[in-house]
């Protein structure tokens, strides 16, 4: 594992590309719950979850953990972040970006997923016969059979995929690319080209969820465990300018929630991550749209955790969690930079954590991991590169305290929420 890249990403306030599960301290119950959810989704279930956490509590980090688990279990995953360019009231744009962001453990893009599947069918046909015409026929039959359930849901989606294979065999690569572009939601395809691969119309706000349902069925039918869609910074919905636009966005969330419960989606997991304001704000948050709020709100007034609720809270770290994560970071740093930190850092580890907990005292001892992680790695980097300078442990503690003060004064503009 590339510890140096992981440490660099964390120091910069970003979520590492890999290895995050190793650092998912204090979230064991949540991780176990999502392991179970992914197993249920593999068995035809469709589920929607909302993650509620303060900025810096680790929502994006936890989404990355879910992503890694999903890849390990052979899911196709898409991660989108809501923004001005991807507002949830424009569900057709959301669909396009979900498809654009598709990944599996072997590669990226819907094109890769389709081509890899067809290549596998061609290899099977090649093993059965050496006759090229019979091979093509076997592949066409296998494609037709694999798309049976998708075809029942939306014939156009299946038709575009079947036509793509046929057009590739005919070496009409231009139209074949149009067929894949149409599946991705491209609305700039000439009518004459769409007619060649047997479809009409485009992905619109009226049918985008229907296309998303077809996509979930398709990826399962060709051998994947299902579809996982991770939607970060869902609180952006509150920034939509009018109540009408926000209501449209919340209604699409409700549609996805209902369609999962009604069985219209299969083998699908949708995870929305947001700050508490989305769930609490009466004027602009989910409570402002009763139809969604009624489905999500907790009827029990209790602080006891319940992982099976639609919304689960991602709490800040406690001192024990910080001790555990700092211990892991210390080991990673020693391995990455080939030095012995035990003499200078281990004796004051409890003091370092204590400083951070004291600084976060206003939160009742619950702390967000991001500031601590960034400060701690900065100190490790500084001490490792200047070992002869640090004669006194108090000097190290002062560096940590100063770094924390700097980070707390920053206006955080990172896209990733550790």
Name every feature range the model reports, one short phrase each.
Residues 1-3, 31, 176-346:
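The catalytic "switch" region of P-loop NTPases
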Residues 16-22, 52, 80, 196-200, ...:
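Glycine- and acidic
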Residues 165-181, 301-305, 315-418:
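C-terminal alpha-helical "lid" subdomain
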Residues 48-53, 57, 61-222, 362, ...:
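P-loop NTPase nucleotide-binding core
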Residues 94-102, 253, 326-330, 376:
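Short amphipathic C-terminal alpha-helix that caps PH/PH-like domains
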Residues 1-47, 389-418:
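A short, basic N-terminal segment
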Residues 35-38, 67, 95, 99, ...:
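Short, well-ordered alpha-helical packing segments
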Residues 61, 124-126, 237, 399-408:
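Eukaryote-specific, cytoplasm-facing alpha-helical/coiled-coil scaffolding segments in long proteins
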């Amino acid at each position: 594992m590339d510890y140096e890249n992981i440490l660099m990403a964390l120091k910069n306030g970003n979520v590492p590309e890999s290895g995050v599960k190793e650092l998912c301290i204090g979230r064991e119950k949540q991780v176990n719950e999502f392991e179970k959810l992914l197993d249920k989704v593999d068995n035809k279930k469709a589920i929607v979850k909302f993650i509620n956490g303060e900025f810096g509590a680790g929502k994006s980090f936890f989404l990355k953990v879910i992503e890694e688990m999903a890849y390990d279990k052979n899911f196709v995953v898409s991660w989108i972040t809501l923004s001005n360019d991807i507002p949830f009231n424009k569900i057709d744009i959301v669909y396009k970006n979900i498809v654009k962001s598709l990944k599996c453990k072997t590669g990226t893009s819907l094109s890769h997923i389709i081509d890899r599947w067809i290549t596998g069918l061609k290899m099977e046909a090649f093993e059965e016969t050496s006759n090229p015409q019979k091979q093509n026929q076997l592949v066409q039959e296998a494609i037709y059979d694999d798309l049976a359930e998708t075809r029942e849901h939306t014939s156009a989606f299946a038709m575009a995929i079947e036509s793509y294979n046929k057009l590739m065999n005919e070496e009409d690569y231009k139209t074949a690319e149009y067929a894949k572009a149409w599946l991705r939601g491209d609305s700039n395809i000439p009518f004459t080209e769409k007619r060649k691969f047997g479809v009409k119309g485009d992905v619109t706000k009226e049918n985008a969820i229907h296309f998303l349902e077809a996509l979930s069925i398709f990826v399962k039918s060709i051998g994947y465990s299902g579809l996982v869609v991770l939607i970060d910074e869902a609180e952006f919905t509150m920034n939509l300018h009018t109540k009408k636009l926000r209501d449209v966005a919340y209604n699409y969330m409700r549609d996805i929630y209902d369609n999962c419960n009604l069985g219209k989606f299969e083998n699908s997991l949708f995870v929305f991550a947001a700050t508490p304001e989305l769930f609490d704000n009466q004027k602009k948050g989910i409570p402002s749209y009763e139809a969604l709020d009624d489905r999500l709100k907790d009827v029990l007034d209790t602080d006891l955790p319940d992982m099976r609720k639609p919304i689960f809270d991602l709490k800040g770290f406690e001192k024990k969690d910080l001790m555990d994560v700092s211990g892991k970071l210390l080991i990673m740093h020693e391995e990455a930079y080939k030095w012995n930190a035990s003499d200078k850092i281990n004796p004051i580890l409890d003091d370092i954590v204590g400083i951070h907990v004291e600084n976060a005292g206003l939160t009742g001892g619950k702390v967000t991991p991001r500031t601590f992680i960034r400060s701690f790695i900065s100190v490790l980097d500084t001490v490792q590169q200047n070992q002869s300078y640090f004669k006194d442990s108090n000097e190290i503690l002062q560096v940590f305290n100063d770094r924390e003060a700097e980070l707390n004064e920053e206006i955080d503009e990172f896209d990733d929420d550790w």
